[in-house]
């Protein structure tokens, strides 16, 4: 939308659309004529190695099967997706849609989303233990997406994931980039690099576990932010420009560009919820919320080992079915209709709160923590009114601080411009004493300020008192939130003398500092704008954002429809099955130690990289696998886990044997079973000798929930398998 003439598309937009149409035609020709030749060559094993590996079902499927699959998925999908994308562009790019739905936003709104997203990813990265991935054998790595190609390239990526020191250094680099993205330093460079590093970090963790979905949505948001002017607000980049007196976007003025960027972030958050809700309806039907199905999901996640030990859902075994139906309906409604946040303002007050409640319920009843999604809901709320209300209340209760500075001092002007940016609640009023009638000012406030004193020291007037120099800065620190953590330290004994000496030294030498912006005026605006501002009037970029949002929607729909699970792409079909059998299968882990004591074991205490969210579950499932090599992978994992654990504990507490048990609980028939089911399968592994014992179809189903004997003679050879 062009603000001046309200044209839907500019000449540049039309050229861009024609270029995209040309590229689409080239893709259709390439996909129709060239790619089938590569498929036939790869089927014969005569193509590049990575293409040959993709065709893994030669013994089952003919080459015609792969050619038909390519035609159906790629060519037909491309045509339908392109037409859908064009339709969405035509709708979302209309002036009415932009004005009523997308809206406009300030640079501070987009900058706040950047800060919050980087803070979420930084927080989740800090509690990861990426370096411990190197303790796992390479056989446990199963690439589940784009990272699979990096392992085959001669760039040393495979050596990286096998080196503990390199992984820890890479994690520190990722944390540094996320922190720099949070504060907004060199945003245009740091944000894409931070997104790339986190993409690699998360991918490595997934390759050694399973495709879990925590922290995936914040990664999507960060990728989107990398293509937006998110550094225009709440950033060091903005502060630096303001301190130099350079032009920056008006902090208080809204723009369609920031509105579109914010809308794109909202879209990548909302679409996964919609996809998950639709997946439940598509896979399980309208009655996914069947109470038996909901009980199955809750009991299964509660009984399986995780980093949290509570079992709240097991206290609900005698609760009425209506409660579980309400839980299911609430989750289904919250997810399916979450997309309304993209169209209605009132929905942005309802569904994010519902999502927070849903994720808290998942955490309490299923022991799965989606901290990233809980925190990310805050990007839908506009806290400007709250901030202004707090500022108004503080001003009425405590009053404002008047800061008198020397407008001819370059250092003073720069300092005041920066302080104005930090003044979140507008507690500070900056006055150039050279523009004041000082006699009238003294008479009105009952003060005795002299021009000579103001030339030497900045003065802060608060409640009729004058605070000069360092003591003025100390008073400012109490009023500006960003300095609140620093303020108490400024009152420690000795700090006042040191601070006054430092301030005096800088004040005496302030004219020796030469700035290009030496005498720019200071006229602070809302949210810390500088005197000289620019407007983001590049409305032509609106069409590009409409095209980008349309592409995001189409890609999400394609992934959902074709059930694509190829990191970082996912279909979001989570918990979409309908299970009304009333039976839950889960696992228990026991360990025997050098002291002879046997008890429940926590694999979460072994290797930190797989300690969260039951990430080790694919490896212990291999203990009961029937495919060649499954048991060997299980043994290698248990050996690595025992080795890592034994390094942390004292002699006598070291693990000598692990046992994995499979239990099945028929909660419909035996809801009051104190053991929550019967033992149906067990796998024991002796760490030192590598000997394994497998016992199936146990005759004695009265096993208590205590540690069973793990010695080899405890399992009869005739009842199981000895390896």
Task: Give the label of every model feature segment.
Residues 436-531:
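Thiol/selenol-based redox catalytic cores and closely related redox-interacting motifs
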Residues 2-443, 451, 512-723:
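Alpha-helical membrane-anchoring segments
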